[in-house]
Amino acid sequence: MKNSRTTFRVIFVSGIFLLGCSLLPIPGIATQPPPTFVPAAEIPTKSSAETSMGLENENLLAEVPSGFKVDYQAQQENQAITEMVAESESVEDWSTMVTVQVYLGETNTTPAQAQETLTQSWFNACEDSESYPVADGAENGYGFLLWQLYCPLNPSTQKMEYTYMKAIQGNDSFYLVQVAFRHEPSDDEITQWMQYLKGVQVCDSRIPERACP
């Protein structure tokens, strides 16, 4: 994954915002992969990434969660997407989904702007939705914002949905990570996934204080 402006290490990049949320010029989001997307290059496994020569330039670091698999990947222009679900589930039928979107070259969007746009889209798609702040600040020198969205009844699935979203503003690209549930997550699940999201960070081999592992 060298010699590219932004590369990925063990990441999953996903474009399924369950209620049709959109941040930048994103094709219509649905519960199926958008037909206009083409398959993206295969994301390396954890073992292959760890034995590589190292990362170059700006990278999003996010390990594949234990018990999960990459079930869909694609890229269209500057938008890279992947969806990850439990090994026994699929993107068509899931209980928990991990989502990341990478907007390559997008440097004008802030986490606050992303939160406002996505939250409004969520509210427009689901009646009686709720949104709650979780955390904000900087991690490894990059600004981020983490918040929760709740839909009591998704009209397209007839199920409740809880989602935690983490937006990170890089120097080269913009990153959006999502953990979604079609059930009310337990306290243990919330703790588990908050720890996971805290570990999702951006690094840059060109900046010593933000160096990649």
PLM features: residue spans?
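N-terminal "mature-domain start" segment
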Residues: 42-80
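Secretory pathway targeting signatures of secreted, lumenal, and periplasmic proteins
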Residues: 66-108
